[in-house]
Design a protein with these regions (language model features):
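Zn-dependent metallo-beta-lactamase
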Residues: 1-47, 51-54, 237-248, 256-258
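Beta-strand-turn-beta hairpins that frame and shape the catalytic cleft
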Residues: 12-17, 30-37, 131-140, 159-164, ...
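Active-site metal-binding loops of divalent metal-dependent hydrolases
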Residues: 41-43, 82, 108, 144-145, ...
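Metallo-beta-lactamase
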Residues: 73-85, 217
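Active-site-proximal loop/helix segments of hydrolase catalytic cores
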Residues: 145-212
Length: 263
């Protein structure tokens, strides 16, 4: 079965949301009305192509892409920042090469998309602390702290009324910067656990999920690249540490392409 058929066959009940991890830091959200929201899908070997001279096989893709660029219909595409495993420069044109999909991104991500051939009328520039209303949800853009390597990274809270789904973007555990997300108490949190390149590790993610009083946490940002090893993203750490640091939050481990329905 193709991933498109799999996705089309998922039926989401009213007051429910489907969350699909598509590998690395990428997710799809599918709504009751069959709208598809994509967040930071990484679908090619773009990072390896970009960095292989410096890192060798360190950023070689080690897991297959869940779907091909252009294979599925996406309504909204959100990019948290311009790093290649979040804004895929080799996939972005095909992702937007239709009459349906719009990209919401920061200025640097916009530049990458335009360089890839995307028309500006397919892109809307966004920044932290903005709020945008859509038919089925409200988008609340939250600050994140990715250090000096990226100062314009954003987090996203998708407020569907019955549930708030939080995608942190790449961030470290800086409670002052993350205060907005903590105050909004999203029920579902999608958090990185690689603990490198300015990101949360498993313990940080558990503490952060506990701060937000999240009911569900789906970890990501692991096992895509050879550099994701040991302290740089071992999911067993999350499995062991969430019961200790976030006892009221259920850890949901997904394999790439697997769906979880909340509600």
């Amino acid at each position: 079965m193709s991933f498109k058929t799999y996705l089309d066959n998922i039926k989401v009940k009213q007051n429910s949301i489907c969350v699909i991890w598509v590998g690395q830091a990428g997710f799809l959200l599918k709504t009751h009305s069959d709208k598809v929201i994509a967040i930071d899908p990484y679908l090619t070997d773009y990072v390896y192509r970009f960095f292989h001279k410096e890192y060798g096989y360190g950023f070689k893709r080690m897991t297959a892409s869940v779907f091909k660029p252009g294979e599925i219909e996406i309504d909204y595409l959100f990019s948290s920042h311009e790093h290649g495993d979040h804004l895929d420069g080799d996939a972005i044109f095909e992702l937007l090469n239709n009459n349906r999909t719009m990209l919401f991104a920061n200025e640097e991500s916009m530049k990458i998309a335009v360089e890839a051939g995307v028309s500006l009328d397919k892109i809307r520039q966004v920044r932290e602390d903005m709020a945008i209303g859509f038919d089925e949800f409200k988008l609340i853009i939250t600050p994140a702290d990715h250090g000096e390597i990226c100062k314009d990274v954003m987090g996203f809270i998708f407020d569907f009324g019955f549930v708030r789904v939080y995608y942190s973007g790449d961030t470290c555990y800086n409670k002052e910067v993350l205060k907005k997300a903590i105050d909004l108490q999203p029920q579902v949190a999608l958090l990185p656990i690689n603990g490198a390149f300015g990101n949360l590790n498993a313990e940080d993610a558990a503490k952060f999920a506990n701060d937000m009083r999240s009911k569900i946490c789906i970890p990501h940002h692991f096992w895509t690249f050879p550099l994701h090893k040991g302290e740089k993203g071992d999911p067993i750490d999350a499995i062991e540490l969430f019961p200790k640091y976030a006892p009221e939050c259920k850890l949901v481990m997904l394999s790439p392409g697997e769906a979880f329905i909340y509600g």
